[in-house]
Protein backbone atom coordinates (compact mmCIF):
# COMPACT_ATOMS: atom_id res chain seq x y z
CA UNK A 1 0.00 0.00 0.00
CA UNK A 2 1.32 3.45 -0.96
CA UNK A 3 2.00 5.82 1.90
CA UNK A 4 -0.91 8.25 2.52
CA UNK A 5 1.42 11.24 2.33
CA UNK A 6 2.08 10.37 -1.32
CA UNK A 7 -1.57 9.89 -2.33
CA UNK A 8 -3.66 12.30 -0.24
CA UNK A 9 -4.25 15.51 -2.28
CA UNK A 10 -3.35 17.83 0.62
CA UNK A 11 -0.57 15.79 2.22
CA UNK A 12 0.95 15.30 -1.23
CA UNK A 13 1.69 19.06 -1.41
CA UNK A 14 3.32 18.98 2.05
CA UNK A 15 5.26 15.86 1.05
CA UNK A 16 6.65 17.45 -2.11
CA UNK A 17 7.55 20.66 -0.26
CA UNK A 18 9.00 19.40 3.04
CA UNK A 19 9.64 15.65 2.99
CA UNK A 20 10.51 14.10 -0.38
CA UNK A 21 11.84 17.36 -1.81
CA UNK A 22 15.14 16.76 -3.64
CA UNK A 23 17.63 19.26 -2.17
CA UNK A 24 21.28 19.97 -3.07
CA UNK A 25 23.65 17.99 -0.83
CA UNK A 26 25.97 20.94 -0.13
CA UNK A 27 23.72 23.80 0.99
CA UNK A 28 25.18 25.54 4.05
CA UNK A 29 23.66 27.16 7.13
CA UNK A 30 22.98 30.28 5.00
CA UNK A 31 20.07 28.31 3.52
CA UNK A 32 18.46 28.02 6.97
CA UNK A 33 17.07 31.55 6.94
CA UNK A 34 14.07 30.70 4.73
CA UNK A 35 12.65 28.30 7.31
CA UNK A 36 13.66 30.68 10.14
CA UNK A 37 11.63 33.43 8.46
CA UNK A 38 8.67 31.03 8.33
CA UNK A 39 9.06 30.44 12.08
CA UNK A 40 9.33 34.20 12.71
CA UNK A 41 6.13 34.81 10.73
CA UNK A 42 4.26 32.15 12.74
CA UNK A 43 5.51 33.59 16.06
CA UNK A 44 4.50 37.11 14.98
CA UNK A 45 1.02 36.03 13.85
CA UNK A 46 0.36 34.07 17.07
CA UNK A 47 1.70 36.70 19.50
CA UNK A 48 -0.02 39.42 17.46
CA UNK A 49 -3.34 37.59 17.66
CA UNK A 50 -3.14 37.42 21.46
CA UNK A 51 -2.11 41.08 21.67
CA UNK A 52 -5.05 42.08 19.44
CA UNK A 53 -7.43 40.43 21.95
CA UNK A 54 -6.46 43.04 24.57
CA UNK A 55 -5.44 46.05 22.46
CA UNK A 56 -7.79 48.95 21.65
CA UNK A 57 -7.10 51.05 18.56
CA UNK A 58 -8.33 54.35 19.96
CA UNK A 59 -6.09 57.35 20.60
CA UNK A 60 -7.54 57.76 24.10
CA UNK A 61 -6.93 54.17 25.22
CA UNK A 62 -4.21 52.66 22.93
CA UNK A 63 -1.27 53.57 25.19
CA UNK A 64 -3.01 52.45 28.38
CA UNK A 65 -4.19 49.20 26.72
CA UNK A 66 -0.53 48.31 26.01
CA UNK A 67 0.30 49.13 29.65
CA UNK A 68 -2.66 46.94 30.69
CA UNK A 69 -1.31 44.05 28.56
CA UNK A 70 2.09 44.32 30.26
CA UNK A 71 0.75 44.67 33.81
CA UNK A 72 -2.56 42.84 34.10
CA UNK A 73 -2.77 40.17 31.38
CA UNK A 74 -1.30 36.75 32.24
CA UNK A 75 2.16 36.70 30.64
CA UNK A 76 1.11 39.78 28.66
CA UNK A 77 4.59 41.28 29.08
CA UNK A 78 6.08 38.11 27.57
CA UNK A 79 3.71 38.16 24.58
CA UNK A 80 4.30 41.87 23.99
CA UNK A 81 8.09 41.65 24.16
CA UNK A 82 8.13 38.45 22.10
CA UNK A 83 6.21 40.35 19.42
CA UNK A 84 8.45 43.44 19.58
CA UNK A 85 11.77 41.56 19.67
CA UNK A 86 10.40 38.95 17.27
CA UNK A 87 10.16 41.75 14.70
CA UNK A 88 13.87 42.45 15.20
CA UNK A 89 14.72 38.78 14.70
CA UNK A 90 12.48 38.77 11.61
CA UNK A 91 14.51 41.59 10.05
CA UNK A 92 17.87 40.08 11.02
CA UNK A 93 16.82 36.87 9.24
CA UNK A 94 15.42 38.86 6.29
CA UNK A 95 18.62 40.80 5.72
CA UNK A 96 20.73 37.63 6.09
CA UNK A 97 18.43 35.86 3.60
CA UNK A 98 18.71 38.68 1.04
CA UNK A 99 22.48 38.93 1.62
CA UNK A 100 22.83 35.20 0.96
CA UNK A 101 20.79 35.62 -2.23
CA UNK A 102 23.15 38.34 -3.45
CA UNK A 103 26.34 36.48 -2.46
CA UNK A 104 25.43 33.15 -4.03
CA UNK A 105 23.60 34.54 -7.08
CA UNK A 106 20.14 33.24 -6.10
CA UNK A 107 18.67 36.33 -7.82
CA UNK A 108 18.94 34.55 -11.18
CA UNK A 109 15.66 32.83 -10.23
CA UNK A 110 13.78 35.95 -11.29
CA UNK A 111 10.23 35.07 -10.19
CA UNK A 112 11.35 33.88 -6.74
CA UNK A 113 13.57 36.96 -6.33
CA UNK A 114 10.86 39.44 -7.37
CA UNK A 115 8.23 37.89 -5.09
CA UNK A 116 10.88 38.12 -2.37
CA UNK A 117 11.22 41.88 -2.98
CA UNK A 118 7.41 42.27 -2.75
CA UNK A 119 7.57 40.29 0.51
CA UNK A 120 10.31 42.59 1.85
CA UNK A 121 8.19 45.67 1.12
CA UNK A 122 5.12 44.03 2.72
CA UNK A 123 7.05 43.13 5.90
CA UNK A 124 8.49 46.65 6.10
CA UNK A 125 5.01 48.19 5.75
CA UNK A 126 3.65 45.85 8.43
CA UNK A 127 6.50 46.65 10.83
CA UNK A 128 6.07 50.39 10.31
CA UNK A 129 2.33 50.26 11.03
CA UNK A 130 2.91 48.03 14.05
CA UNK A 131 5.32 50.59 15.48
CA UNK A 132 2.55 53.21 15.41
CA UNK A 133 0.09 51.12 17.45
CA UNK A 134 1.44 51.60 21.04
CA UNK A 135 0.76 55.34 20.49
CA UNK A 136 3.87 56.58 22.28
CA UNK A 137 5.79 59.70 21.27
CA UNK A 138 7.96 57.91 18.71
CA UNK A 139 4.90 56.05 17.34
CA UNK A 140 3.04 59.31 16.71
CA UNK A 141 5.96 61.31 15.34
CA UNK A 142 7.30 58.38 13.33
CA UNK A 143 3.88 58.02 11.69
CA UNK A 144 3.71 61.77 11.04
CA UNK A 145 7.18 62.01 9.49
CA UNK A 146 7.10 58.82 7.40
CA UNK A 147 3.59 59.34 5.97
CA UNK A 148 4.53 62.96 5.24
CA UNK A 149 7.11 61.71 2.71
CA UNK A 150 4.24 61.03 0.33
CA UNK A 151 3.59 64.76 0.16
CA UNK A 152 6.80 64.94 -1.92
CA UNK A 153 4.88 63.36 -4.82
CA UNK A 154 4.14 66.22 -7.23
CA UNK A 155 0.55 67.48 -7.61
CA UNK A 156 -1.29 64.72 -5.66
CA UNK A 157 1.09 64.49 -2.66
CA UNK A 158 -0.80 66.56 -0.07
CA UNK A 159 -4.18 65.03 -0.98
CA UNK A 160 -2.67 61.55 -0.75
CA UNK A 161 -1.23 62.19 2.73
CA UNK A 162 -4.55 63.53 4.05
CA UNK A 163 -6.34 60.56 2.50
CA UNK A 164 -3.99 58.14 4.32
CA UNK A 165 -4.34 60.09 7.58
CA UNK A 166 -8.13 60.23 7.29
CA UNK A 167 -7.97 63.90 8.33
CA UNK A 168 -5.59 66.83 8.55
CA UNK A 169 -3.19 65.15 10.98
CA UNK A 170 -2.28 61.73 12.39
CA UNK A 171 -5.24 60.97 14.67
CA UNK A 172 -7.85 58.38 15.66
CA UNK A 173 -8.73 57.52 12.04
CA UNK A 174 -5.05 56.89 11.24
CA UNK A 175 -4.52 54.65 14.26
CA UNK A 176 -7.66 52.59 13.54
CA UNK A 177 -6.78 51.98 9.89
CA UNK A 178 -3.14 51.20 10.72
CA UNK A 179 -4.34 48.57 13.19
CA UNK A 180 -6.63 47.05 10.55
CA UNK A 181 -3.81 46.94 7.98
CA UNK A 182 -1.31 45.66 10.54
CA UNK A 183 -3.69 42.78 11.29
CA UNK A 184 -4.44 41.79 7.68
CA UNK A 185 -0.96 42.20 6.12
CA UNK A 186 0.72 39.20 7.84
CA UNK A 187 -1.88 36.91 6.26
CA UNK A 188 -1.18 38.48 2.85
CA UNK A 189 2.53 37.91 3.60
CA UNK A 190 1.77 34.24 4.39
CA UNK A 191 0.02 33.90 1.00
CA UNK A 192 2.99 35.56 -0.75
CA UNK A 193 5.32 33.12 1.04
CA UNK A 194 3.37 30.25 -0.55
CA UNK A 195 3.88 31.83 -4.00
CA UNK A 196 7.57 32.43 -3.18
CA UNK A 197 7.96 28.71 -2.36
CA UNK A 198 5.93 27.66 -5.40
CA UNK A 199 8.33 29.53 -7.70
CA UNK A 200 11.36 28.22 -5.79
CA UNK A 201 10.23 24.61 -6.18
CA UNK A 202 9.79 25.15 -9.93
CA UNK A 203 13.54 25.59 -10.29
CA UNK A 204 14.89 23.88 -7.18
CA UNK A 205 17.26 25.43 -4.69
CA UNK A 206 20.56 27.10 -5.54
CA UNK A 207 23.74 25.96 -3.74
CA UNK A 208 27.00 27.62 -2.56
CA UNK A 209 28.98 26.64 -5.67
CA UNK A 210 26.33 28.07 -8.01
CA UNK A 211 26.68 24.94 -10.19
CA UNK A 212 23.53 22.92 -11.11
CA UNK A 213 23.17 20.10 -8.58
CA UNK A 214 20.67 17.85 -10.38
CA UNK A 215 23.09 14.91 -10.27
CA UNK A 216 23.62 15.23 -6.51
CA UNK A 217 20.36 15.55 -4.57
CA UNK A 218 19.34 14.30 -1.13
CA UNK A 219 15.84 14.16 0.43
CA UNK A 220 14.86 17.21 2.47
CA UNK A 221 13.72 14.97 5.33
CA UNK A 222 15.56 13.96 7.53
CA UNK A 223 18.73 15.85 6.46
CA UNK A 224 17.46 19.41 6.28
CA UNK A 225 14.53 19.08 8.69
CA UNK A 226 17.04 18.26 11.44
CA UNK A 227 19.24 21.14 10.30
CA UNK A 228 16.24 23.51 10.36
CA UNK A 229 15.25 22.40 13.87
CA UNK A 230 18.76 23.26 15.08
CA UNK A 231 18.27 26.69 13.49
CA UNK A 232 14.90 27.05 15.24
CA UNK A 233 16.48 26.33 18.63
CA UNK A 234 19.19 28.92 18.05
CA UNK A 235 16.67 31.48 16.78
CA UNK A 236 14.39 31.00 19.80
CA UNK A 237 17.35 31.22 22.23
CA UNK A 238 18.55 34.64 20.99
CA UNK A 239 15.32 36.66 21.43
CA UNK A 240 14.60 34.83 24.70
CA UNK A 241 17.95 36.01 26.09
CA UNK A 242 17.13 39.49 24.84
CA UNK A 243 13.57 39.74 26.12
CA UNK A 244 14.22 38.11 29.50
CA UNK A 245 17.26 40.25 30.34
CA UNK A 246 16.85 43.56 28.48
CA UNK A 247 13.53 43.60 26.58
CA UNK A 248 13.76 47.32 25.76
CA UNK A 249 17.33 47.18 24.44
CA UNK A 250 16.24 47.68 20.82
CA UNK A 251 13.32 50.01 21.57
CA UNK A 252 13.20 53.77 22.03
CA UNK A 253 12.67 55.27 25.52
CA UNK A 254 10.53 58.03 23.94
CA UNK A 255 7.87 55.43 23.21
CA UNK A 256 7.18 55.13 26.95
CA UNK A 257 5.81 58.68 26.86
CA UNK A 258 2.20 58.89 25.59
CA UNK A 259 1.80 60.56 22.17
CA UNK A 260 1.64 64.35 22.38
CA UNK A 261 1.10 66.33 19.14
CA UNK A 262 2.31 69.52 20.89
CA UNK A 263 5.71 68.18 21.92
CA UNK A 264 8.24 66.96 19.33
CA UNK A 265 10.95 64.51 20.52
CA UNK A 266 14.55 65.81 20.02
CA UNK A 267 15.47 63.01 17.58
CA UNK A 268 12.77 61.34 15.52
CA UNK A 269 14.06 57.99 14.30
CA UNK A 270 12.49 54.68 13.22
CA UNK A 271 13.29 51.21 14.60
CA UNK A 272 16.90 50.04 14.09
CA UNK A 273 16.04 47.86 11.08
CA UNK A 274 14.95 50.91 9.04
CA UNK A 275 17.88 53.15 10.02
CA UNK A 276 20.00 52.38 6.93
CA UNK A 277 17.18 53.53 4.61
CA UNK A 278 16.48 56.51 6.88
CA UNK A 279 20.16 57.54 6.67
CA UNK A 280 20.02 57.39 2.86
CA UNK A 281 16.85 59.52 2.92
CA UNK A 282 18.46 62.14 5.19
CA UNK A 283 21.66 62.33 3.16
CA UNK A 284 19.83 64.11 0.32
CA UNK A 285 18.80 67.73 1.09
CA UNK A 286 15.89 67.67 -1.40
CA UNK A 287 12.63 66.12 -0.13
CA UNK A 288 11.55 64.35 -3.35
CA UNK A 289 15.14 63.25 -4.05
CA UNK A 290 15.40 61.81 -0.55
CA UNK A 291 12.14 59.87 -0.89
CA UNK A 292 13.23 58.48 -4.28
CA UNK A 293 16.60 57.44 -2.79
CA UNK A 294 14.76 55.77 0.12
CA UNK A 295 12.55 53.72 -2.24
CA UNK A 296 15.48 52.94 -4.54
CA UNK A 297 17.61 51.69 -1.62
CA UNK A 298 15.28 48.66 -1.51
CA UNK A 299 14.02 48.62 -5.12
CA UNK A 300 17.63 48.41 -6.34
CA UNK A 301 17.38 44.70 -5.47
CA UNK A 302 15.13 44.30 -8.54
CA UNK A 303 17.93 45.64 -10.79
CA UNK A 304 20.65 43.31 -9.40
CA UNK A 305 19.79 40.31 -11.69
CA UNK A 306 20.28 42.51 -14.78
CA UNK A 307 23.67 43.72 -13.54
CA UNK A 308 25.04 40.17 -13.25
CA UNK A 309 28.01 40.23 -15.62
CA UNK A 310 29.97 37.27 -14.28
CA UNK A 311 30.20 33.93 -16.08
CA UNK A 312 29.92 32.31 -12.64
CA UNK A 313 26.73 32.43 -10.65
CA UNK A 314 28.07 32.40 -7.09
CA UNK A 315 30.69 34.66 -5.51
CA UNK A 316 32.34 31.60 -3.95
CA UNK A 317 35.26 31.67 -6.43
CA UNK A 318 35.29 35.44 -7.13
CA UNK A 319 37.62 37.21 -4.65
CA UNK A 320 37.19 40.78 -6.01
CA UNK A 321 33.39 40.53 -5.81
CA UNK A 322 33.69 39.04 -2.32
CA UNK A 323 35.69 42.04 -1.10
CA UNK A 324 33.08 44.41 -2.60
CA UNK A 325 30.25 42.42 -1.02
CA UNK A 326 31.76 42.71 2.47
CA UNK A 327 32.46 46.42 1.92
CA UNK A 328 28.74 46.72 1.08
CA UNK A 329 27.83 44.95 4.35
CA UNK A 330 30.14 47.28 6.32
CA UNK A 331 28.60 50.25 4.47
CA UNK A 332 25.08 49.17 5.46
CA UNK A 333 26.17 48.85 9.10
CA UNK A 334 27.67 52.36 8.87
CA UNK A 335 24.38 53.69 7.43
CA UNK A 336 22.46 51.98 10.27
CA UNK A 337 24.69 53.76 12.81
CA UNK A 338 24.37 57.13 11.02
CA UNK A 339 20.55 56.81 10.87
CA UNK A 340 20.45 56.80 14.67
CA UNK A 341 22.67 59.89 15.03
CA UNK A 342 21.53 63.55 15.10
CA UNK A 343 21.69 65.58 11.86
CA UNK A 344 24.97 67.43 12.48
CA UNK A 345 28.62 67.41 11.40
CA UNK A 346 30.37 64.93 10.88
CA UNK A 347 27.38 62.54 10.65
CA UNK A 348 25.86 64.33 7.63
CA UNK A 349 29.05 63.90 5.56
CA UNK A 350 29.57 60.27 6.66
CA UNK A 351 25.94 59.52 5.71
CA UNK A 352 26.35 61.10 2.27
CA UNK A 353 29.59 59.24 1.53
CA UNK A 354 28.07 55.94 2.75
CA UNK A 355 24.93 56.50 0.61
CA UNK A 356 26.97 57.20 -2.54
CA UNK A 357 29.13 54.13 -1.80
CA UNK A 358 26.01 51.94 -1.35
CA UNK A 359 24.61 52.78 -4.79
CA UNK A 360 27.98 52.82 -6.59
CA UNK A 361 28.98 49.37 -5.27
CA UNK A 362 25.76 47.79 -6.52
CA UNK A 363 25.36 49.72 -9.79
CA UNK A 364 28.96 50.24 -10.93
CA UNK A 365 31.68 48.44 -8.95
CA UNK A 366 30.16 44.94 -8.72
CA UNK A 367 29.42 44.62 -12.48
CA UNK A 368 32.92 46.00 -13.21
CA UNK A 369 34.52 43.50 -10.80
CA UNK A 370 32.62 40.68 -12.54
CA UNK A 371 33.98 41.74 -15.95
CA UNK A 372 37.54 41.95 -14.55
CA UNK A 373 37.18 38.46 -13.03
CA UNK A 374 35.95 37.09 -16.37
CA UNK A 375 39.00 38.63 -18.03
CA UNK A 376 41.40 37.18 -15.43
CA UNK A 377 39.91 33.70 -15.96
CA UNK A 378 40.09 34.26 -19.76
CA UNK A 379 36.33 33.61 -20.11
UniProtKB/Swiss-Prot annotation:
UniProt KW keywords: Electron transport, Heme, Iron, Membrane, Metal-binding, Mitochondrion, Mitochondrion inner membrane, Respiratory chain, Transmembrane, Transmembrane helix, Transport, Ubiquinone
Location relative to the cell: Mitochondrion inner membrane
Entries under SUPFAM superfamilies matching the protein: a domain/subunit of cytochrome bc1 complex (Ubiquinol-cytochrome c reductase) (SSF81648), Transmembrane di-heme cytochromes (SSF81342)
Reported cofactor(s): heme b
CDD domains given in the database record: cytochrome_b_C (cd00290), Cytochrome_b_N (cd00284)
Keyword Zinc in annotation: no
Binding site for a ubiquinone: 201
Residues where heme b b562 binds: 83, 182
UniProt-listed InterPro entries: Cyt_b/b6_C, Cyt_b/b6_C_sf, Cyt_b/b6_N, Cytb/b6-like_sf, Cytochrome_b, Cytochrome_b_C_euk/bac, Cytochrome_b_N_euk/bac, Di-haem_cyt_TM
Annotated cofactor note: Binds 2 heme b groups non-covalently.
Pfam family membership, one: Cytochrome_B
Membrane-spanning intervals of the chain: 33-53, 77-98, 113-133, 178-198, 226-246, 288-308, 320-340, 347-367
GO annotation terms (biological process): mitochondrial electron transport, ubiquinol to cytochrome c
Residues binding heme b b566, per UniProt: 97, 196
Gene3D superfamilies given in the database record: Cytochrome Bc1 Complex, Chain C
Oligomer status and interactors: The cytochrome bc1 complex contains 11 subunits: 3 respiratory subunits (MT-CYB, CYC1 and UQCRFS1), 2 core proteins (UQCRC1 and UQCRC2) and 6 low-molecular weight proteins (UQCRH/QCR6, UQCRB/QCR7, UQCRQ/QCR8, UQCR10/QCR9, UQCR11/QCR10 and a cleavage product of UQCRFS1). This cytochrome bc1 complex then forms a dimer.
Family: Belongs to the cytochrome b family.
Task performed by this protein: Component of the ubiquinol-cytochrome c reductase complex (complex III or cytochrome b-c1 complex) that is part of the mitochondrial respiratory chain. The b-c1 complex mediates electron transfer from ubiquinol to cytochrome c. Contributes to the generation of a proton gradient across the mitochondrial membrane that is then used for ATP synthesis.
Name of protein: Cytochrome b
Gene name, Swiss-Prot/TrEMBL: MT-CYB
Amino acid sequence: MTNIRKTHPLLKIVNHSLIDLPAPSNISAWWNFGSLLGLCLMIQILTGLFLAMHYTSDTATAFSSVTHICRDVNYGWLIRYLHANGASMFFICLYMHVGRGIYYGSYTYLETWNIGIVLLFAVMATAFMGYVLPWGQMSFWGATVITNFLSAIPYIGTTLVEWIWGGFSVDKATLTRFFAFHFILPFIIAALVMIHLLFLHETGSNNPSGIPSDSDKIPFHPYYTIKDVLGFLMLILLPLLLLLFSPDFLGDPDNYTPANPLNTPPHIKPEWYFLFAYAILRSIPNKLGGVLALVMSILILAIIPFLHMSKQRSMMFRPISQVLFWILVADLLTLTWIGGQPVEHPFITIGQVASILYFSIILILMPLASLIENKILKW
